[in-house]
UniProtKB/Swiss-Prot annotation:
Belongs to the pseudouridine synthase TruB family. Type 1 subfamily. The gene is truB. The active site is at 47 (nucleophile). It catalyses: uridine(55) in tRNA = pseudouridine(55) in tRNA. Its EC number is 5.4.99.25. The lineage of its organism: Bacteria, Pseudomonadati, Pseudomonadota, Gammaproteobacteria, Alteromonadales. Keywords: Isomerase, tRNA processing. Gene3D superfamilies: Pseudouridine synthase (3.30.2350.10), PUA domain (2.30.130.10). Responsible for synthesis of pseudouridine from uracil-55 in the psi GC loop of transfer RNAs. This is tRNA pseudouridine synthase B. It is an enzyme of class 5 (isomerase). One of its GO terms (molecular function) is tRNA pseudouridine(55) synthase activity.
Amino acid sequence: MARRSKGRFIDGIVLLDKATGMSSNFALQRVKRFFNANKAGHTGALDPLATGMLPVCLGEATKFSQHLLDSDKRYLVTAKLGQRTDTSDSDGEVVQTRPLEFTEAQLMSALEHFRGDTQQVPSMYSALKYQGQPLYKYAREGIEVPREARPITVFELNFIGLEGDELTLDIHCSKGTYIRTIIDDLGEMLGCGAHVIMLRRTQVAHYPYDKMVTLEQLEALVAKAQEEQLDPSSLLDSLLLPMDTAVADFPEVNVPDASAAYLMQGQAVRVSGLVADTLVRITLGTERRFVGIGEMNQDGLLAPKRLVVLHDQAKAS
């Protein structure tokens, strides 16, 4: 007998504004509990030190979390110049202290080095795995392991200000970019060392900054619902963004009702007007109900790749 899943069927994306000092998984579990969701997943961890946008996918939205993981990100970062730490942030131990002896022109020249397409060697204090273990576990044991440089793109690197020994930058970058590594490398280029003291993720993909909510706000809504003897979902669910916003950049293909049943059974259906090998967002019928993503093949057929479970059908079956 199949084990019954706990929690309710609720699909959507919460733009959580993660607070500092907590892990991304801790934040995820709190959101899942507030919404009483049957399943949840985040779209790229933030370090405990970091704050800001952490999209949390609930229910069927978890099927599309990888697309947000692969998306561009934007960060506001403040670095302390003159001190290098073993973790490249303020959670680590200071390993070197040097005076600030660079000019403004040298700073601007150094910043230019990081713009565009570059190669980055990930920090030992990262979640990347080597022989099945996260790098940070080796680092904590004092073990250095080989890491290959990876291609990254910094689309924008904007100088915000320099006050004393604190430098603030705005960075728009590709997936897999380690801001701590940029700051550490910048400090070495300037000859003084540097580490991150504040890191805030301000954007993931196209999601708006003003749609973020904190755990405290969610907790307050749950408390309000209890006081007014309401179901918490009546106050919380309006905060959810539609799950297809995770793949909003994909072109839409609307499948007519006549072909919908075939598609939902995993069969390819014929559509026209799109190039082969194109990933698309699939909607059904006149209601344009989002049901997943698919790919156009060489024969002009739309092959489903990732379909959602329609809960009204699930209950009926």
